[in-house]
């Protein structure tokens, strides 16, 4: 096994399956460790996509509060968000921070959401998502991996820190890091899903970049 695969096994042994991306069931956010069939409805797919926008520049707990506010207000659907005023959306997603910017991003996203097709290939989906104002590579790839269950590796600040801590990679742009992981692993959305979630868990648990599994 290469070092990237060995590290994955160590993370999995240490932290267990993470159950990402969490979805709303009943009136609470629920994780689903080991169940990679989720999302298994259009409603859950949309939840994940909106969650990926809300978690930009904040932690998941803040994004979670904003997502639940939209759900409680019965606005967590493309047609309802399209009709809602920016003022109403901004007030509900305030816990996620940058709420005015995120409101505009959500409005822009729902305008295009109906054009997204799960049957599209990854490159086509990614190109389309990146053409939507307010969606960068991390958000687009999170939607592709977690909402559409397609094998693309998500890169974030935790991933870069993880790479530095384990001497895997110390420089490069977003796609350099993404391709590094994708070439080192079997192309399976379940592995990419779990590995990224485990790296996020590692990032939250570790106190410094010197905390490693080597």
What are these regions (language model features)?
Residues 60, 75, 149-153, 168-171, ...:
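Alpha-helix boundary/capping and short turn/kink residues
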Residues 1-119, 187-191, 195-214:
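N-terminal polyanion-binding entry modules of DNA glycosylases/AP lyases
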Residues 68, 127, 157-160, 179, ...:
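A generic structural signal for well-ordered alpha-helical surface patches
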Residues 82-85, 89-90, 129, 173-185:
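Short, well-structured alpha-helical segments that form the helix of a local strand-helix-strand
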Residues 76-77, 119-122, 169-177:
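Short, charged, surface-exposed loops that flank catalytic or proteolytic processing sites
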């Amino acid at each position: 096994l290469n070092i990237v695969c060995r590290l994955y096994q160590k993370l999995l042994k240490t932290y267990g399956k993470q159950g990402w991306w969490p979805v709303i069931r009943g009136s609470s956010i629920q994780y689903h460790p080991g169940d990679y069939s989720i999302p298994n409805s259009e409603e859950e797919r949309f939840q994940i996509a909106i969650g990926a926008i809300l978690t930009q520049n904040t932690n998941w707990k803040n994004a979670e509060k904003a997502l639940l506010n939209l759900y409680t207000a019965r606005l967590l659907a493309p047609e309802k968000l399209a009709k809602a005023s920016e003022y109403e959306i901004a007030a509900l997603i305030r816990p996620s921070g940058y709420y005015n910017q995120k409101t505009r991003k959500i409005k822009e996203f729902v305008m295009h959401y109906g054009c997204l097709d799960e049957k599209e290939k990854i490159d086509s989906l990614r190109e389309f998502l990146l053409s939507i104002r307010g969606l960068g590579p991390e958000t687009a790839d999170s939607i592709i991996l977690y909402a559409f269950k397609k094998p693309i590796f998500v890169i974030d600040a935790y991933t870069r820190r993880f790479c530095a801590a384990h001497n895997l990679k110390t420089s490069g742009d977003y796609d350099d890091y993404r391709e590094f992981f994708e070439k080192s692993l079997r192309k399976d959305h379940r592995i990419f899903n779990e590995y990224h979630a485990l790296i996020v868990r590692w990032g939250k648990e570790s106190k410094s970049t010197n905390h490693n599994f080597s």
